Amino acid sequence: GGIGYQGGGCPPYIIHVIDSEWGYQHMGLIVQKFGGSSVADADKIRNVSRIITETYRRGHSVVAVLSAQGDTTDDLIEKAKEINPNASRREMEMLLSTGEQIACSLCAMAIEAMGYPVISLTGWQAGMRTNSNYSNARISRINTERIQNELDKKSIVIVTGFQGINKYDDITTLGRGGSDTSA
């Protein structure tokens, strides 16, 4: 597949056209990645939703990977420090993974309100398996069955970036820039 940028200056999103890399047989799959500034508020989420649905209307299967809104991750880190400056890495993973879940749910709700079939999935629901290196995990494998099943139902799939699950079923995060890795 190839990578293309749309937009001016620093791109608000990246589109990856995936062909056989994930084992999909059809050429119409487009994976779109949206960073935190592009989903920072309700208007921006609606704009992202329009971009996603426009791609879908053109006949493509769409998987969108979203980051947490704006400074959400930094805000969550600050809240954790207020409660426990020495919080365990596992508990930090639990907390930090929520930012992407919020963004994905809100985007799915916006797409749903526009009348399109959509489902949001966490990294682990999407089959992202990682090692146990908390806060800097690496993807060890991806089971794309759930994503493929949803695409086969003609749903738009919105996936949380930045996160997966390890062999102990603990949430892990991929570190800064992890949503790009997820895409």
PLM feature segments, named:
Residues 3, 10-12:
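Short, low-complexity intrinsically disordered segments enriched in A/P/G/S/L with frequent Arg
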Residues 18-183:
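Nucleotide/pyrophosphate-binding catalytic subdomain
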Residues 9, 16-19:
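Intrinsic structural disorder/low-complexity segments
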Residues 1-3, 17:
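Ser/Thr/Pro/Gly-rich low-complexity, intrinsically disordered segments
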